[in-house]
């Protein structure tokens, strides 16, 4: 229809209705002013004038122009239809994109929440636990080292006390041997016994348990008459009693040392077992820390991807809104243009059916002849 209309308008462009003709009222002239703004209005008036000038029937003219107006109405209806379809597509697309954006925002929130409230606290907790395990290992080794040093010191003390006891027992045995041979002891022999007692006292000076007994024994040895067999037996008995006590003490020292060594070895086993457990726990915790670090990296990558996806969706939504806004502007402009043309067409058709238009055509024909 547009091609036909353009061709016809080109043909009719050489003709124009004389709006200053006396047949037109002021209202008609206002209508002409509005119609002139419309290509279709001008076309209908010029077409109507030409049709009537060539002997056409007004009823036929009305029919043809009505068909043209109907075609305009159909085209406008198609514009409305296409815009309605575009609106449906737009609404569905916006609904889809907004739902996807909402879902993506929820994914972004969940990813950030998982990172902030799970992975980071877990990382800090694992680091603190690993630090505690390493401190436990260090403390375990310090405890073992201290126990080893203490055991060595205690054993050295044991050996020192054993040497002291053996030295004292040896002196006692020597004194007993001397005393057993005495019948009429000489001053030299008595002094040797007294010297042995002093030696015993020096050997056992750290053992207060024996000091009082040895001191008493020294006093007896100094004051006793070794020629007196009763006094001699008393001294022998005292020496033997002291020897028994020293042997008992030595046996107790040996038993205590064996028990201490046994306890130490058990403690070493326990500490080494604890150390092995700590080491295994470090391996496990290190693996957990590595897994946590990998998960943090994956989550940060996921957050980047989700943000990129969200930006893409927002971009698509903005593009759709912009495209629809442009389509709406085009639609409104098109509808406005069609309405203007239809309004002008109806006004032109109304003028064509006025008796004044027929009078105008007749006057134009008379003027031509």
Curated annotation (Swiss-Prot):
Keywords, alphabetical: Coiled coil, Signal
Signal peptide limits: 1-16
Cellular compartment(s): Trichocyst
Primary location: other
Presence of the UniProt keyword Calcium in the record: no
Sections of the chain in a coiled coil: 56-180, 262-354
Domain of life: Eukaryota
Gene Ontology cellular-component annotations: trichocyst
Keyword Aminoacyl-tRNA synthetase: no
Propeptide regions on this chain: 17-55, 190-225
Post-translational events: Two components are produced by post-translational processing from the precursor peptide.
Function: Structural protein that crystallize inside the trichocyst matrix.
Record family assignment: Belongs to the TMP family.
Protein name: Trichocyst matrix protein T1-B
Phylogenetic lineage: Eukaryota, Sar, Alveolata, Ciliophora, Intramacronucleata
